[in-house]
């Protein structure tokens, strides 16, 4: 990790220095593990008491928490956002070699921009267009006529099928598959007849996709991922799904076909969302949500039964299973009381 003076770091982060600005910062760590040469952050005043035992050389915090800090500090309005920017400055992610590995297989009909990097055993088929500064990791497959915008990076073993469009400055983690066939079949007297998926996948700019996520191509129209969308690991995005700009999708989410999700939504982990319906802008669905109907109003939508001790859960489950009968009995009692 690169070293940097605290004062220089503060200048890049637009932060106020309190304490020794000449302190050399060698890394970022959590509150409980930070050493005197490292910097940490306090994003929630509820954990203010941790400052008393923190050994970090400096802490990123708000003005309100400064009196409780025994070390040097960088004072900012939003410590967590500052931490994100600080991590970018001190990032240790290996940078790719600016070359094309000898083992890469590249079609003569592919078009490569300037400073493109292609790892060993990657396959680039005919008609592919790679913008400037694109990075294709080792073992990737890029299918025919796919376009990848400038500055985008695919880690090792990403598979992108034919005629997919990926925008600029996207980041796609290993094992992800984009543009595989959607789950389309017609039934002929008990036999499943495959429907070729004739659409594609269009991904906007600044999209990040986690490891081992699958985004299927559309049946006729395209599956669309908007600008600024972030998708976690092991998600399944079915054919013809549309995800609006700047929506966040946590790990393990399953979206059924032809679902339309609005902008600025947040989908909690392991949620399952029905297809052929719409979720409006600015909806937050909590983890393990089961969404069976359209959502037309912005807001927070929890689902499911939170964890309980087994004995309590069994009683809760029994009540839920018998809710219809309980409701009928209650209405009968109400009618009896009304008559009296």
From Swiss-Prot:
Listed GO cellular component terms? Answer: membrane
* Pfam families recorded: Hexapep, LpxD
Q: Which example biological process does GO assign this protein?
A: lipid A biosynthetic process
The EC number(s) attached to this protein equal 2.3.1.191
User: What are the alphabetically sorted keywords of the record?
Assistant: Acyltransferase, Lipid A biosynthesis, Lipid biosynthesis, Lipid metabolism, Repeat, Transferase
Q: Which residues cross the membrane?
A: none
Annotated active site: 239
- Give the enzyme class: transferase
Q: Where is the signal peptide?
A: none
| Single annotated GO MF | UDP-3-O-(R-3-hydroxymyristoyl)-glucosamine N-acyltransferase activity
Q: Which reaction does it catalyse?
A: a UDP-3-O-[(3R)-3-hydroxyacyl]-alpha-D-glucosamine + a (3R)-hydroxyacyl-[ACP] = a UDP-2-N,3-O-bis[(3R)-3-hydroxyacyl]-alpha-D-glucosamine + holo-[ACP] + H(+); UDP-3-O-[(3R)-3-hydroxytetradecanoyl]-alpha-D-glucosamine + (3R)-hydroxytetradecanoyl-[ACP] = UDP-2-N,3-O-bis[(3R)-3-hydroxytetradecanoyl]-alpha-D-glucosamine + holo-[ACP] + H(+)
Name the pathway. Glycolipid biosynthesis; lipid IV(A) biosynthesis; lipid IV(A) from (3R)-3-hydroxytetradecanoyl-[acyl-carrier-protein] and UDP-N-acetyl-alpha-D-glucosamine: step 3/6
Please give the subunit comment from the record: Homotrimer.
Stated role: Catalyzes the N-acylation of UDP-3-O-(hydroxytetradecanoyl)glucosamine using 3-hydroxytetradecanoyl-ACP as the acyl donor. Is involved in the biosynthesis of lipid A, a phosphorylated glycolipid that anchors the lipopolysaccharide to the outer membrane of the cell.
Q: Which family does it belong to?
A: Belongs to the transferase hexapeptide repeat family. LpxD subfamily.
Annotated protein name in UniProt = UDP-3-O-(3-hydroxymyristoyl)glucosamine N-acyltransferase
Origin organism is Yersinia enterocolitica
| Gene that produces this protein | lpxD
